[in-house]
Amino acid sequence: MWLGVITLFPEMFRAITDFGVTGRAIKNGLLELHTWNPRDFTHDRHRTVDDRPYGGGPGMLMMVQPLKDAIQAARTAAGDGAKVIYLSPQGRKLTQRGATELAETQKLILVCGRYEGIDERIIQTEVDEEWSIGDYVLSGGELPAMTLIDAVSRLVPGVLGKQASAEQDSFSDGLLDCPHYTRPESLDGLEVPAVLLGGNHEDIRRWRLKQSLGRTFLRRPELFENLALTDEQTRLLAQFVDEMDSPQKS
């Protein structure tokens, strides 16, 4: 997968290129990540990248010419088929389903805003889609871009090593993840559930699914609004609720 980022702070993306899952994927050639700094496309000795908004008001906007030229340079490097995304509070909220859709795109160019944002005409002429990571204010688009890159990269074949890891993540099937345990078997008086020690793979699968359903029911019940539960899921959720109401049955 090819990724381009338009940012005033390219050094921030070392968190993506040098560390963790994405760093390994880049090293192994599964991902490419390139950055373009609008400051490199300025024509004044101060390398100015901000400008006053028409109509007045507080703050500044990113200057049009350096930003537009940086996007064009990224498009040229990407070649045909690149999708330009602006990280914006007005955009579609990123979910696991959205990340899966974006992972099917082979080339993404992410535009990171700063100051009070960018000129609306840049959005109209240069941007294909706007995406948001949530309803809160950040200082720029870099952290949302890194979040999107990490979420999408995990879905690129080979990045996680085992595709099952991505398939079992929270939200991959619309549900929260089940609880996980490692050694020791007993920790401060709390025991690993016996089913996980028994070695019966089908029992373990059902337990994990039931816990996933139950955790979603308790913590994010609104997620069920977009799900059509199977007969097995409906039965396991009912068991979870029954056991929660009657602990002696568990």
UniProtKB/Swiss-Prot annotation:
It is found in: Cytoplasm. S-adenosyl-L-methionine binds at G113, I133, G134, D135, Y136, V137, L138. One of its GO terms (molecular function) is tRNA (guanine(37)-N1)-methyltransferase activity. One of its GO terms (cellular component) is cytosol. Homodimer. Belongs to the RNA methyltransferase TrmD family. This is tRNA (guanine-N(1)-)-methyltransferase.
